[in-house]
């Protein structure tokens, strides 16, 4: 559940950033395309980094050793 919710948050942030980029940096069609490409690429890269770290924590390669403290 948390994976889907956070993925949706990344999607919403990407859409809002794309809209803000289109409004604030409106300098022509080729420049708009470059800015939107950079924003979308940055959003996808941040999401992929988060997803890889999140999924890696589900099945760790090294099992933690618990000490028996009484």
From Swiss-Prot:
Segments crossing the lipid bilayer: 1-21, 36-56
InterPro entries according to UniProt: ATPase_V0-cplx_e1/e2_su (IPR008389)
UniProt GO molecular function: proton-transporting ATPase activity, rotational mechanism
Keyword Transport: yes
Top-level division of the source organism's lineage: Eukaryota
Compartments where located: Endoplasmic reticulum membrane; Golgi apparatus membrane
Principal location class: endoplasmic reticulum
Pfam family, one: ATP_synt_H
Keyword annotations from UniProtKB, A to Z: Endoplasmic reticulum, Golgi apparatus, Hydrogen ion transport, Ion transport, Membrane, Transmembrane, Transmembrane helix, Transport
UniProt keyword annotation of Transmembrane helix present: yes
Record-level GO cellular component terms: endoplasmic reticulum membrane; Golgi membrane; proton-transporting V-type ATPase, V0 domain; vacuole
Membrane topology: Multi-pass membrane protein
Assembly and oligomerization: V-ATPase is a heteromultimeric enzyme composed of a peripheral catalytic V1 complex (components A to H) attached to an integral membrane V0 proton pore complex (components: a, c, c'', d and e).
UniProt record similarity statement: Belongs to the V-ATPase e1/e2 subunit family.
The protein's role, per its UniProt record: Subunit of the integral membrane V0 complex of vacuolar ATPase. V-ATPase is responsible for acidifying a variety of intracellular compartments in eukaryotic cells.
Name of this chain's protein: V-type proton ATPase subunit e2
């Amino acid at each position: 559940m948390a994976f889907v919710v956070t993925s949706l948050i990344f999607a919403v942030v990407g859409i809002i950033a794309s809209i803000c980029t289109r409004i604030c940096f409106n300098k022509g069609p080729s420049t708009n395309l470059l800015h939107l490409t950079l924003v979308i690429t940055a959003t996808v890269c941040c999401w992929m980094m988060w997803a890889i770290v999140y999924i890696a924590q589900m099945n760790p390669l090294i099992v933690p050793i618990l000490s028996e403290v009484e």
